[in-house]
Amino acid sequence: VKSAQKKDKEMVEYDSVVITGGADDMAPSSGDMMENSVLSSEESLDYSTTNVMTDGVDESDVVKTDGKYIYMVEDGQISITDITDGKPDEEQKLRPDFESPSDSVEELYVNDGNMFIVTNHLNDEGNDETICYSYDITDPLKPQLIGRSSQDGYYSTSRKIGSIVYVFSNTSIQMPELMVKKAALNPNNLDKWVPKVDGEIIDYDCIYIEDETTSGTVISSFNVDDPSAVIDTKCIMNGNDDVYVSNNAMYFYSMDWKRNRQITTISKMSFTDGIMETGESTSVSGYLNDKFAINERNGYLYVLATYSDKETEVNSLHVFDGEMKETGVLNEIARGELVYAARFVGNYVYFITYKQTDPFFVADITDPSDPKLLGELEVSGFSEYLHIWDDTHVLGIGYGDSDRKTIKLTMFDVSDPAHPVEENQKIFDHEGYYCEAMNNYKAVLVEPQKNLIGFAVDKYYLFSYDSGKGFELMEDASLKFENERGYRGIYKDDDFYVAGNGEINYFKLTGKKS
């Protein structure tokens, strides 16, 4: 990577192709260091994948590619565009066999000849359901429906490990009044208030109630090739703030106020090949202000929490073992500051705080019983997202000013963890009012091996990086729907695509923008 950074970058030749139309709708047939790339040995295709939290744990998104086609969520359907020859070509529209016209496609997976679609549905009783469809895409322009599944609740997120998908939906249990509890517990009435998966109520021994709450998460697991055959189902009633998924466990966390103190409860659920098993719970003072502020490595869970009140803010780093017992803690970090971005890798955690001095921190987590703060660097501006660039560099994407009117890219040199250095920075103006990359890591493309950094604001900005020259703009592709969510940068070999909201911009990766 270092040698690649020192090479002069080739010129980008912008060959503008915008795809917004397509063929007629087709009725379906019944019947981390994270590198965002896949190299197919069979056909030597090098193409990007979704930016994910955990290496080895795939995540659904609104745009996917298998190196031959681009699959994009578009107005309640999926558009499938042929990119075999580079330039976007033949396109097909797939509209799932919805339960009702108001159903919406949320996200999808594409792997090994299979397309898995997640949708939201409002049933006849006015309750939310998550419905998943699985398609055989051996011929991507003629997808064949092979199975479906449903579960109560509004779709929240999902994860895929191998061929097993875990789907999470937010639900609420309307507990019956005391005077009618006996009637409600009648098996004939249970389906009125107990969540269901594929029309079957969840077994009582698979429902876990953490506290006095009526909201929680339904989790189901199944093979992508046969979603109708549910492997396992669980429901955890914990307030459903968010979930972090490692390679072998889920950690559900939710914040609550108790006696004017912020408490975040974290509950562990282990899994193997789709079978889920509940574990222990713990709690920390404060809340998690960044999705990457929680991480599991080597059997330990690390949590970077922020506590704030009317007077000040303070942060702390907690370490828990497999039984969720605290083994170590680092208190009193950056008083008066809020954690805005974090990233765990190897024996270190890197994080940015923001409010007054906006420092970049490095903490050593080699010893789970004794985490230590190693280095601190005060910088202007602040990062909302951190990404590991290589063994000695961390990329930051954020804002150059408190008004968020400028975007700032930063490359931190962490070769000496005790003395981090801002190696290069780039601050640029933009005409947008929203940058999805700041709130959704899946909207970011970072590929050190191809020297690409991309994200959308008012345009799609694509940069390269050289330690001597800094960040260099490769392209700023215009977007039909400026400031919209859902645009993704995708590459296949030397072809680059900006796909989202029904359009595809295409250009060749042949050099920096002149």
Role assignments for model-derived ranges:
Residues 1-514:
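Beta-sheet-rich non-transmembrane sensory/scaffold domains
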